Amino acid sequence: MRVALQRTLDTSFHFWKSERSLHTLDARAMELLAEVDLAAFAQLPAVELSYGRKRALEIATTLAMEPQLMLLDEPTQGMGTEDVDRIRQLIKKVSANRTILMVEHNMSVVSSIADTITVLQRGALLAEGPYAQVSRNPQVIEAYMGTAQTELVGAH
């Protein structure tokens, strides 16, 4: 497995764990890569992965801890459409049986993933609820779109 920066599989590493323990860890790492749809890239150095796939790898390393709560800070920022869709699907997939607290400004991503949306303005709670309700809230529209004439849609 070559997801460690620029090291290759045949590069010597010195570990304090036994070889058998390392094989167990390799097997778990491969499971995690498969879970985030990166198994086909296991032999590539992480530096060669696209930005979106690097973010998926970050999610895999978080999943290794089997968290009940995951914090994601703008997970799709700076991504192209294809990577955004891939990460959106991945977040939806890994959200089963865990809580995900996500800061995200891409309303398309938010609307397709979130059960509950909390909108803050200058640190104060502006609105909270399902996307359909929050996106029609006049205060939210005014704060983020500048007018209460239209519904909050699209990406920020």
PLM ranges: what are they?
Residues 1-156:
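Glycine-rich phosphate-binding loops of nucleotide-dependent enzymes
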